[in-house]
Amino acid sequence: MSRIFAHTAMLDFAVARSAMTGLNMDRLGGSVASFDNLYLPRLHRAGYVAPNASTDHTASPGGFVLDSQPGIYDHVLVLDFKSLYPSIIRTFCIDPLGLALGGDESLSQDATVPGFLEARFAREGHILPELIRQLWDQRDAAKGASDEPLSQAIKIIMNSFYGVLGSPGCRFFDARLASSITRRGHQILGRTRDYIEAAGHRVIYGDTDSVFVWIHEAGDSEEAHQAGRELERALNKWWRDELAREFQLDSVLELEFETHYQRFLMPTVRGSDKGSKKRYAGVVSRGGEDRLVFKGLENVRTDWTRLARDFQLELYRRVFMDEPFEDYVRQVTAALRAGERDADLVYRKRLRRRLDDYQRNVPPHVQAARLCEQRGLPVPRRGSWVEYVITTAGAEPAQAPLAPLDYEQYVERQLQPVADGI
């Protein structure tokens, strides 16, 4: 355990975050309390008193996800807005005090910045944008000093501010605050897509703070990288010019060319021809070596069997490398039905509640856990991992199944969904 703590610098991170927020290390998850400890002293020094907890529970929209275009592509770039929500707060002067001041009818329109849901934020006298600027500078200094625990602590604190302002448990909660962040993010992502496509490229996906761009005219990796660098430079300049022209604001939005996928797969939604969301795979080159990257797919999910994860890894590798894959699919299916892959058919899932608390729609891992006692096995408790297999009689403990394994269920639920994605 001590080696894990040393390798991950968890204690250094906890100490750094505790020192910055004023919370004890056993309360580091308290984002609202962290925000209060950072914001309230500044509010009081400005001569204002904080309100009680809000009774407004109006929901605000989440991150914007662009429809994906399923298919296999060469040369896909990921352009990512660095700390998008903190950048929006800084750029557009979004702040609880600024919102209150912006509602003063004596202020001219030029003295405020428009938000959403009829919000207006004062250009002067706000607190949160300056607090984020200070944290941003501290993070840059921590990065320069190679202080990763401090840098990570600051990043988490900054990124928590949107969630706090969107939480009814926050005394400053106001739907206009959170919506002015997320809806501005929607607008930024949409206009970024429009700019890229007007430049002759194609955006095949986007999610919250990132856009995925197909550089279809690139002949090799160098041309794709050059296009990524040019898009980064041009878009950052365009956003500076647009916000200065439209709002008379100094933009701190920063778009970065983050990743180049030499080959990229956007799968379809199961049973549909529509593109999926938050699920994709691709090949990146690092240090001269090609590496497969999976996001949201079966290969990175612990609740899928080793059979499915191994199958997906090799199947996608063959597809990306233009190698034959049809015979491979048949071979794996035949080996499964012949009982040659039994060791790879174990599901693993954690119990989130006590066994007695599951009454309706009892999931398979709970069914297997309830069989443990009668088969002389330790009974899993809440928080324990349950290993089970699917047999012709249903879910059974992996350590002591009685019925034969249901191979057809594994074909339909583990192999077929992976293959259908391609």
Regions found by a protein language model. Name each.
Residues D140, V213-H216:
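A broad detector of the eukaryotic-type serine/threonine protein kinase catalytic domain
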Residues R3-H7:
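Hydrophobic, small-residue-rich alpha-helical packing segments that form membrane-like cores
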Residues T91-K143:
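Short, exposed interaction patches on small structured surface elements
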Residues P70, D140-A141, R176-A178:
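A short, structure-level motif marking secondary-structure boundaries and short turns
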Residues R123-C170:
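Active-site cores of enzymes that catalyze phosphoryl transfer or operate on phosphate-rich substrates
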Residues V164-R183:
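Gly-rich Lys/Arg/Thr-decorated short loops/hinges at beta-loop-alpha junctions or inter-strand turns
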Residues L11, V15-L101, L107-T112, S146-I157, ...:
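DNA-dependent DNA polymerase catalytic subunits
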